[in-house]
């Protein structure tokens, strides 16, 4: 409990009922410490991590939350108190919420400002409208974000990516800040155990999901996110760590009591894991993570009734007191694990269409480019894609182009379908037969391209080849479906 000091700033003539006072922030208030960590993450996001979020959007979220809090409390109490809780809710909204189309570096963009304002307003209002036992039932920013994502959809409201970029000084500082600040603050509030139980349970469930072969698509990864990459993305994401230390540990909306707190943390981890196991896109996975907390907060009164706070609240004593308690906990845990396994096995992104084996093509030395450059866009995708990968994909694309030449010459549409897909295949099929040119390739550029009309779509590799065809200078740019091999050309970009 933080003791706040009240300082009167305005006194009206008449009785004391007309006296207004101001309650400033206290340096001992844990909410101020949480705010300092989250604001520091926001600063790093702007200067080092490339957040697609403007300063204006942050201010709209903070300002809306603070204004509504003051309008709801000041006239009734005649106390103008520093809106610490509202500012935390507004900052939580701004830290997670993104509006597609916002560009990093456009500091004062008000693009989608109304989405931030409405979500922040919903967060604060939920504290006063949805209550149980004299306190908010749901975590304000959590319930507001989930409602925004489910109602508005990915084209209007999108959660911050789980992957925050390749390891860098800025990202290392972010991890240090979240971990150090999270441990210190939750330890002071006696909630470190809640964070630990959640993370251990969640990480174990995500390991089960990954080992079951589950994967998801993400707008920052060339292929499906699977295996070790899936586990590290979910278990070690800065966004998940913020959820662990600063969202599920809200003292006002978490379960009270030592045992109830442990059950609450494990329940959130289990609920989120079950929902995640059935998702095949990063967007749905992020919403599922947040939705797990909503579901458990809705059932928080049941958890507190099952494990009431009191003298016999020690987890070991509670666990051993009644056999029925152990049966219930183990039964719920087993059911959750079974659902995690089922979801992980049955839900996966649609597999690419199978094609017949590619014909063998032997590249001449003059068809292997001497120079393969890497574009800046490759730094914005997850996984590992280096020079060797780029050279393999370029060779694969050159082979595909030669196969297309052969298919056009012979009118073999089936052959073309082995190395082409989508709009490019449709274009090739319509070409009249013509002699295959003698091509050479001198240089290549490998970069990443995204579909501006589909914000959540996976990126494509963009391969630009330069050389000659029948002795005439030739260059072309292709969008290909590929990770490190078996490239299939999806589109040929017309030269401008």
Region spans (language model):
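Internal active-site segments that recognize and position negatively charged phosphoryl groups
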Residues: 152-211
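N-terminal signal-anchor module of multipass membrane proteins
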Residues: 2-76
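Exposed beta-sheet edge and beta->alpha loop/turn motif
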Residues: 350-355, 438-496
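Structural signature of hydrophobic alpha-helical transmembrane segments
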Residues: 49-64, 100-118, 160-175, 226-240
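Membrane-interface helix-loop-helix junctions at boundaries between adjacent transmembrane segments
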Residues: 75, 79-169
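C-terminal ends of transmembrane helices
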Residues: 17-21, 45, 66-78, 122-136, ...
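Internal/C-terminal transmembrane anchor helices
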Residues: 320-348
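Core segments of small alpha/beta cavity-forming domains
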Residues: 370-437
